[in-house]
């Protein structure tokens, strides 16, 4: 790539992440991340609530983890060979861009449902490479059918990738500023995970200024809805009629409810006991946890036989 004049180079996500960035660029990126963490820690401390004590500890652990990565890079003395920044990439098209949605967000709202907290190395790697291309005068294009899958907060991640300069112009320097501008945390009663009662839960799920948010996002987004795509297929000479997605009878899915078997009712009671034990720290996380409970419950809802370990 570095010594040839290709029109395009196509590679899979797995191959892309194997191309490293120059250590110096990585160090600058990580130091910027540390600055963001310091700001988030200061804001969490300024809040002063008992609830934010746990948030501060979480952010400080994240800061130490980033500082550890800085030390690792600083200790590397060997020649890296050809790195991504030396390949001369001036335009990057990323298909299935939702695969990189787990870009870690530094926030004082980490204990609130609806705020993304997942972090993946491949998302951080993609973000670093996107920023390098953009700062070098190049362009980045994302393509995905699911830019938002779990929460509206994922839109902030897409904006970080594609229009961070616009966020800076709007004085939105972090997720908390974005959340205050476009959303609100709501406290409400919800059915507990095991279904045995109710619990008070805070969720980031009320939004406002939506027209302004979408106008901002549409500066970088071309959005195609299902009906728009269906119309394009119907009017296309390249597509056959049978390529049109079939419609549900009555234009919507029909839910068929059935009574649980006695065995399933017994299993649900066991799920409640497991959940209580987990919440009371009566069981070690490696022995049982909510991820296992959720997975087992999904299997049981299909067929109890799927829980049998062969």
Task: Report each predicted region and the residues it spans.
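Short, flexible, mixed-charge acidic loops at enzyme active sites
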Residues: 26, 105-110
């Amino acid at each position: 790539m570095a010594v040839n004049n290709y029109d395009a180079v196509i590679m899979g996500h797995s191959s892309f992440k194997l191309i490293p960035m120059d250590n110096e660029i990585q160090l600058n990126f990580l130091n910027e991340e540390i600055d963001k963490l310091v700001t988030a820690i200061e804001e969490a401390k300024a809040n002063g609530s008992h609830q934010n004590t746990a948030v501060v500890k979480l952010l400080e652990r994240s800061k130490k983890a980033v500082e550890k990565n800085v030390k690792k890079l600083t200790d590397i003395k060997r020649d890296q060979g050809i790195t991504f920044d030396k390949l001369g990439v001036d335009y990057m098209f990323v298909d299935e861009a939702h695969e990189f949605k787990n870009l870690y967000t530094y926030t004082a709202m980490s204990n609130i449902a609806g705020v993304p907290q997942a972090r993946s190395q491949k998302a951080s790697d993609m973000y670093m490479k996107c920023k390098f291309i953009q700062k070098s005068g190049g362009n980045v294009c994302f393509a995905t059918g699911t830019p938002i899958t779990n929460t509206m907060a994922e839109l902030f991640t897409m904006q970080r990738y594609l229009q961070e300069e616009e966020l800076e112009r709007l004085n939105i320097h972090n997720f908390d500023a974005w959340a205050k501008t476009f959303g609100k945390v709501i406290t409400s009663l919800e059915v507990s995970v095991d279904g045995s009662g109710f619990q008070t839960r805070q969720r980031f799920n009320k939004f406002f200024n939506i027209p302004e948010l979408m106008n901002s996002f549409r500066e970088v987004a071309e959005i195609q809805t299902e009906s728009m795509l269906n119309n394009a297929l119907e009017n296309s000479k390249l597509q056959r009629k049978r390529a049109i997605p079939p419609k549900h009878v009555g234009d919507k899915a029909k839910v068929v409810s059935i009574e649980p078997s006695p065995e399933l009712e017994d299993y649900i009671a066991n799920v409640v006991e497991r959940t209580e034990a987990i919440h009371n720290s009566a069981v070690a996380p490696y022995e049982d946890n909510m991820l296992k409970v959720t997975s087992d419950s999904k299997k049981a809802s299909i067929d109890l036989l799927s829980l049998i370990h062969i």
